[in-house]
Amino acid sequence: KDTNGDHVADVRKTLFDGFTPAHPQMQIGNPRWGLDNWIYLNYGPGKITSSRNPDNTVTIPRRDFRFLPETMKFEADSGMGQFGNTVDRWGHRFYCTNRNPIMTTLMRPAVMTRNPYSVISRGHYDVGKSGGETRVYPRVEMKSNYLSHAGTHTSACGVTAYLGDLLGPEYVNSVFVCEPIGHLVTRSIVAPDGLTL
């Protein structure tokens, strides 16, 4: 909170604590306000507590994290994004890992656990090809620790749903993903495919 108008926060509060420190790509981050008024963050494992309700501890496995700013209610969310978190014009949230350029949520954990007979084991899925099935055409020689990664996404990040209209109607429903190792940005057109995208 800026109390004296100098555009610098004078009051800082920790809202949540307990996230497990790990590699940079496995840190809580990339907050995005969803159309449902929850704030979504990538990858928040740990034993999480809230400063507003310190008696409530939630153990979050290797998943994304979300909270309601008004009540500070918080919970695990489907997905395990790393560097990138975006919401398209229809409210679909997309995120990525280094080898999975565009992922989204099919069902939230709370919905899946209500039915003990559910055959769905994870609530997120790849919107397009992932891992060794992706193809990128870099402008430079891509260096990788694994030969099988050549010509594929190895460091996907910054997933962004294009919401503007400046580029023209052909860019509606486009999702861009950075691939820094190959010095390029990939573009995918996301469209409904039955119950999924």
For the regions a protein language model found, what residue spans apply to each?
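Beta-propeller domains with acidic blade repeats across secreted/periplasmic ectodomains
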Residues: 1-197
